[in-house]
């Protein structure tokens, strides 16, 4: 029977949750790297035994870890992330220039075809690539070199490149999302990038419809329809039907259009999921009721999903990297909370169960579907 491996990054280590295809009984392994913040860990689509992890500490800095046996053993790999070329500064919160400084790896995105190739999104925002399993990293400097680079400003969590979408057709398109500069896309494998923010509007900007400056929390894509992109912005849920060239709002009847995560059902490119959060100052679900909302119409209409989720007194957050889907049918949906719970649904969101409780605050959730 097929199986599922859920990779959970938390503020105090990584945990690996496994189940067979029924997804009704789970084993929990961890913590790996106990005491360290694990911003993200993700498995290679080309080799399920290859997993990359971003290990970070305010005291000891950044370490990239690699496993070749499904997370049983780990090896520290290359950890030098050197910016090349300009610009020399970006804008700070108050608008003053500030030198670019590497802090941590926010997101790791393995190649869809080659387990040795992996991309890293970092803070301060830049995109790096390794062709040797993470041993050496080279900046794809065309992103920061865009004429707007010196005007990028951080969001509340810093100036971070937190999302990387690789071309599911095998081509050279790359989409990245930066808080808070916006979405940038490349058609040539990362040599050059252009903003993809037309249609976004942010009231906190001097020009709400500016080319850059939008606090994009997450973007998602389905491989069967790569021209359609979905976005959870600081406020607003958005959709693009033309590869990010234009966006329009699809928040509809959601109880709040603020949130962090968004994902797409593996078996239906028009079925998407979000977790509404009350506001940018109240980081918990509306009325303390933890709910996932699902749209089967690409965002035109939404329905509340709560069977098995807390109905009251729930004041947790679900962060941008903390939701993922498996590739089984029916599709499994998984998310983690800042309260340390990881919830899973084996039936596309109709019902939920707590896979594990009382972990440290969950920073990221990724899923591997195993043969």
Model-derived features: positions:
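Extracellular glycan-interacting surfaces
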Residues: 1-371
């Amino acid at each position: 029977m097929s199986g599922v491996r859920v990779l959970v990054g938390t503020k105090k280590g990584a945990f690996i949750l496994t189940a067979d295809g029924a997804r009704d009984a789970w084993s929990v392994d961890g913590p790996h790297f106990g005491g360290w913040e694990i911003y993200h860990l993700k498995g290679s689509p080309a080799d399920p035994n290859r997993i990359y992890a971003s290990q970070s500490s305010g005291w000891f800095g950044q370490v990239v870890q690699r496993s070749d046996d499904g997370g049983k053993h780990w090896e520290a790999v290359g950890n030098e992330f050197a910016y090349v070329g300009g610009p020399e500064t970006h804008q700070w919160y108050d608008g003053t220039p500030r030198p670019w400084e590497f802090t941590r790896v926010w997101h790791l995105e393995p190649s869809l075809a080659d387990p040795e190739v992996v991309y890293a999104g970092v803070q301060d925002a830049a995109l790096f690539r390794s062709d040797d399993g993470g041993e050496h990293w080279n900046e794809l400097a065309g992103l920061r070199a865009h004429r707007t680079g010196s005007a990028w400003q951080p969001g509340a969590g810093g100036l971070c490149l937190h999302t990387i979408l690789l071309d599911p057709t095998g081509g050279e398109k790359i989409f990245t999302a930066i808080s808070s500069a916006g979405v940038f896309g490349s058609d040539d494998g990362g040599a050059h990038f252009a903003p993809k923010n037309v249609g976004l509007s942010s009231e906190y900007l001097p020009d709400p419809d500016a080319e850059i400056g939008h606090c994009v929390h997450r973007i998602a894509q389905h491989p069967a329809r790569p021209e359609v992109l979905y976005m959870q912005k600081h406020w607003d849920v958005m959709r693009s039907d033309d590869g990010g060239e234009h966006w329009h709002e699809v928040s509809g009847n959601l109880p709040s259009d603020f949130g962090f995560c968004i994902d797409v059902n593996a078996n239906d490119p028009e079925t998407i999921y979000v977790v509404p959060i009350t506001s940018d100052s109240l980081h918990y679900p509306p009325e303390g009721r933890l709910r996932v909302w699902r749209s089967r119409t690409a965002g035109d209409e939404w329905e509340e999903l709560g069977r098995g989720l807390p109905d009251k007194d729930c004041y947790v957050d679900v962060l941008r990297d903390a939701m993922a889907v498996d590739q089984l049918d029916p599709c499994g949906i998984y998310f983690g909370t800042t309260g340390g719970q990881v919830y899973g649904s084996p039936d596309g969101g109709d019902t939920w169960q707590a896979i594990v409780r009382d972990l440290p605050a969950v920073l990221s959730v990724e899923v591997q579907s195993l043969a």
